[in-house]
């Protein structure tokens, strides 16, 4: 795998990467760790990822018994450790609010001398890094610009190192009413649909199958809006929620609790970790990865979901009308109907024969 542009700009500043116990936050598996180990010899490397795909890739490569290079991996919404890191490299997140969340999260495991490196492509908005972090970092300066990327380095403000991180402080809650059903939704920074109900999901909730019962799969659950609505409207359902994002999964779990519901909440790379069969599958399938448009995960989901449906089971999705999901559903599931169209979105339903 070729090095990404952010990884390349990091490696051309190798003097900034010297560390005994570096922490890599949300870096992809693109060969950077191998390149890092060729020029530096840390005691250990900790890789923290909120994206399940990146976590799986790094774990598979570096954490097998035959290829252990002292690389430790963590998939979670928050990072907990007793290690004091002397370097933290953070991939600039798609959500600017997520950056300060991430910095606050690591205050317990760094010190005044820990270098904080922020790296990302310009189109992600990293130009504003110094302004965004002015209340947390001191001397946050741009040190390189290349390959359409920027690299910033800074240090924690000493008084912020003692801040106690409380996950509950970072949830944003909002209240919505759909078909007379009141919901309270909680979402962490960076989670889709934070602070409001998006148009597509609203259209989906108004056009679900009648009398839903049995096992339900909410694919790409985000903050859990769809499952919370189904759970409160249809009491005979058992909810399963999956997402690739640890931040989304934690948000969904919180949303379920706030609405007096429970469910099986788990990570999956498309359908990689789906082991059950379902009577109903519902989704507002994601097609953005970071700031990039990415369709493959949703297309793989639609092509493979027939193997996870009960006989006579159905799938209902909402998508931007320009996305050609209907032919995929027709080919792999069966007859696919357009339930409704509105405001650039279309609701489709297919039933397994």
Predicted regions: what they are:
Residues 85-91, 278-286:
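Short SAM/SAH-binding signature in class I
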Residues 2-71, 199-283:
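Conserved SAM/SAH cofactor-binding pocket of Class I
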Residues 105-110, 304-311:
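Conserved helix-to-beta-strand junction in the class I
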Residues 246-247, 283-306:
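Mobile active-site "lid"/loop adjacent to the S-adenosyl-L-methionine
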Residues 50, 121, 243-248, 293, ...:
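Short beta->alpha hinge that forms the Motif I/post-I loop of the SAM-binding pocket
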Residues 98-178:
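N-terminal auxiliary segments of SAM/dcSAM-dependent transferases
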Residues 308, 315-353:
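C-terminal catalytic and target-recognition region of SAM-dependent MTase-like enzymes
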Residues 4, 147-215:
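SAM-dependent Rossmann-like transferase core, predominantly class I methyltransferases
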